[in-house]
């Protein structure tokens, strides 16, 4: 069945003018999701342009199955556009991607964080540079294959304002990675797959006769060959591979390691020490290159402090979260459902109190905020986790350890 004969998608673009008078740029990664978006919009009669970004060319990474925007993906996107009968363009964003995504990714690991480069890519490349390019091409919208919903916000005092909501397919929910999308970007972006389950997306791809119908989903971090973070970090930041001590929360030196880049908060396997008790990575002390370990209960966190907060509520952040705070739901992991929380803003900063404690929260990760726990919950934005507070005894032990002098 051709794209012209398919039923309309569940999520429309909400424009007042006719589709044939509406130009839409589709960000095409070469995967099934963005390809189906292009096909659905073409079927509805929109003036569709496909754009693929050449983001990197790092040897093995380009040829790795499941990578995004690499050589094969560009070819796949081109074939899809030929099948659909729409123009396709490839833009070289390698330098920009390296400066705004890859280098900060490595720097974050050196600082003892566990970064999310996909958020940075959306912030600085896809929803900034590509969006600007779409506007230069006279497009009315930039459409992507993300699983998230957007629709007009009836509570907004500004006509045309849109809000983000969780998608129909909770297993494919990408709202966690899109918390940093600004209001201006949301108003211009469209997400036609927000109301579709993934299985339906693949079915549509087969009906359209697209070469990517059975293509595997892309991996989260596209530029890391075979998932070996340490290789690219060591290449860009050799200091991250410097040896250091593995220290217990109680101050005992238990062993040594070959670089904090090999560890993340909450890790148990592969620490490299045998003590007869289960120990977990509790903190990465980048300044003194110490990996601090402790029992599982030392990981439990009820409060996280945020930086670079992107607030998408109807009131200002200060109005909403001062005083008793803003009751909401929070996700500190992409795979978890939103859980009850309270957002606060005061003299100490912006922080979220989690009603149910979470274990192994790492700085550099995200905390996304929602109106409710279920699908179609509104996305209120979020921020990057700057630090977390553990249960009192573990927090006291950690502060004492960090304040103590380190042997030369």
Curated annotation (Swiss-Prot):
In this chain, the stretch annotated as Interaction with tRNA covers 172-174
Q: Name one GO molecular function term.
A: ATP binding
E.C. number: 2.8.1.13
Disulfide pairs here are 121-222
InterPro entries recorded for this chain? Answer: MnmA-like, MnmA-like_C, MnmA-like_central, MnmA-like_central_sf, Rossmann-like_a/b/a_fold
The processes (GO biological process) annotated in the record are: tRNA wobble position uridine thiolation
For binding ATP, which residues are annotated in this chain's numbering?
Answer: 27-34, 53, 145
Q: Which Pfam families match?
A: tRNA_Me_trans, tRNA_Me_trans_C, tRNA_Me_trans_M
Task: Provide the protein's localization.
Answer: Cytoplasm
- Its chief place of residence is cytoplasm
- Give the reaction(s) catalysed: S-sulfanyl-L-cysteinyl-[protein] + uridine(34) in tRNA + AH2 + ATP = 2-thiouridine(34) in tRNA + L-cysteinyl-[protein] + A + AMP + diphosphate + H(+)
- What positions are marked as the site Interaction with tRNA? 146, 365
What residues sit in the active site?
121, 222
Keywords on this record?
Answer: ATP-binding, Cytoplasm, Disulfide bond, Nucleotide-binding, RNA-binding, Transferase, tRNA processing, tRNA-binding
The record's listing under Gene3D superfamilies reads:
Adenine nucleotide alpha hydrolases-like domains, HUPs, Translation factors
Q: Mind telling me which GO cellular component terms the entry cites?
A: cytoplasm
* Top-level taxonomic group: Bacteria
What this protein is reported to do is described as: Catalyzes the 2-thiolation of uridine at the wobble position (U34) of tRNA, leading to the formation of s(2)U34.
Into which family does the record put it?
A: Belongs to the MnmA/TRMU family.
Q: What is the name of this protein?
A: tRNA-specific 2-thiouridylase MnmA
């Amino acid at each position: 069945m051709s794209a012209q004969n398919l039923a309309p998608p569940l999520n429309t673009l909400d424009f007042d003018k006719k589709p044939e008078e509406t130009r839409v740029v589709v960000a095409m990664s070469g995967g099934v999701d963005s390809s189906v978006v292009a096909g659905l919009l073409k079927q509805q009669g929109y003036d569709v342009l496909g754009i693929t970004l050449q983001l990197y060319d790092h040897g093995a990474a380009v040829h790795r199955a499941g990578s995004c925007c690499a050589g094969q993906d560009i070819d796949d996107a081109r074939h899809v556009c030929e099948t659909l009968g729409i123009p396709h363009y490839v833009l070289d964003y390698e330098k920009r991607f390296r400066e705004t995504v890859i280098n900060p990714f490595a720097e974050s690991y050196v600082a003892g964080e566990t970064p999310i480069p996909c958020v940075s890519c959306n912030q600085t490349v896809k929803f900034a540079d590509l969006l600007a390019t779409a506007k230069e091409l006279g497009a009315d919208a930039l459409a992507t294959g993300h699983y998230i919903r957007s629709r007009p916000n009836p509570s907004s005092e500004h006509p045309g304002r849109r809000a983000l909501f969780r998608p129909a397919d909770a297993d494919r929910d990408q709202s966690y990675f899109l918390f940093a999308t600004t209001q201006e970007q949301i108003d211009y972006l469209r997400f036609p797959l927000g109301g579709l389950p993934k299985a339906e997306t693949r079915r549509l791809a087969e009906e359209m006769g697209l070469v990517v119908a059975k293509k595997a989903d892309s991996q989260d971090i596209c530029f890391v060959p075979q998932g070996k973070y340490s290789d690219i970090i060591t290449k860009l930041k050799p200091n991250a591979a410097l040896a250091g001590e593995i220290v217990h929360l109680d101050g005992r030196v238990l062993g040594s390691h070959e670089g904090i880049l090999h560890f993340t908060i909450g890790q148990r396997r592969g620490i490299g020490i045998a003590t007869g008790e289960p120990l977990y990575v509790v903190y990465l002390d980048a300044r003194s290159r110490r990996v601090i370990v402790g029992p599982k209960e030392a990981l439990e966190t009820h409060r996280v402090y945020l930086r670079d907060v992107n607030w998408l509520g109807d009131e200002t952040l200060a109005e909403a979260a001062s005083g008793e705070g803003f009751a909401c739901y929070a996700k500190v992991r992409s795979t978890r459902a939103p859980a009850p929380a309270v957002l606060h803003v005061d003299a100490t900063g912006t922080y979220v109190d989690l009603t149910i404690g979470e274990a192994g929260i790492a700085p550099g990760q995200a905390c996304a905020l929602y109106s409710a726990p279920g699908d179609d919950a509104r996305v209120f934005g979020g921020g990057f986790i700057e630090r977390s507070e553990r249960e009192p005894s573990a927090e006291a032990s950690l502060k004492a350890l960090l304040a103590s002098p380190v042997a030369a």
